[in-house]
Amino acid sequence: MIFALLSWLAQAGAQESFNPLETNGMVRIVVAHGDHLLNAFLPDQARVEAVFNRGLTGFTRQNSVTGAWLSLLSTNDIVGIKVFSEPGPVAGTRVAVVAAIVHGLMAAGLPPDRIIIWDRHLADLQVAGFGSLGQVLGVRVAGAEEAGYDTNTFYLPDSPVTGQLIWGDLEFGRTNKDFNLGKKSFVSKLVSRQMTKIISVTPLMNENAAGVCGHFYSLALGSVDNTRRFEGNPDRLAVALPEIDALPVLGDRVVLHVTDALLAQYEGGPAGYLQFSTVRNELWFGHDPVALDVMALKELMLQRRLLNVPLMPANFAIYTNAVLLQLGIADPARIGIEKTP
């Protein structure tokens, strides 16, 4: 499987444009493409929403947007829309994509007070424009750190690395002799106590240690504290990201993964750099975060080759470990990609 994955990713350099492997595999990824979704790198809300709805109905095989959403969740759920807002409004998860989700959920009968747009830091959400969106639509916008962390729900790896605790971490400032002090990453109360379903929406953006700021990177590091011990270290990320996402309070609640591929940023992430970005005008839909993140790695490698930019290491071990935990499929022969008409 790993040889097949490496070969598939390597083929990106030989292609003139992104043409994912078309198969009848066990995993479906739906790609929705539109024309002129961006104007001077800013999304056209109406066009983005139309393409999003086309992709959603195609992925769920439903005849209506309402039917699509109700096939994934119920109006009694509390839905958390996990965004990646750190890069800002242009390069991070885009407000227009999330607005399309909120409009669809509300039209399907979900009350606005049962919708939460969230990320790790409230300040990042505000800068990225989600605070304003929340005010306009009447939905909550919340930071995982500001909500506090749950002492009863945590990640403790088999071979823990003691973290350098900082302000905001649950155990910061404690001076007791607890053997496990700094070895746990506690899940935010926002996740463990305030939502029943999660929709993950990530940009198509590189990250040097993880390869891509994808669904594993965004959900894992956005949901728990004491993450400095993993960040920037490819080996530690390869273990921690899949294991955190495998926590039932996280992985079992995700009903949809959406990759915001309106732009592809192949260098500089997680900061936003338009000079390292190309327009893709696409949204990708799937249940499998492994397949989507592997697909993102391939696309970013392709962009670097097309632009004669030196290739960056891709952290394949994340997805090897994720497959071992049965979180998804990385074998390209088992990833079927459908393009909406």
Task: Give a label for each model feature.
Residues 8-16:
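Bacterial Sec-dependent signal peptides at the C-terminal "C-region" and cleavage site
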Residues 15-75, 86-88, 92-99, 106-341:
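Extended, low-polarity segments enriched in aliphatic/aromatic residues
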Residues 1-8:
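Bacterial N-terminal signal peptides
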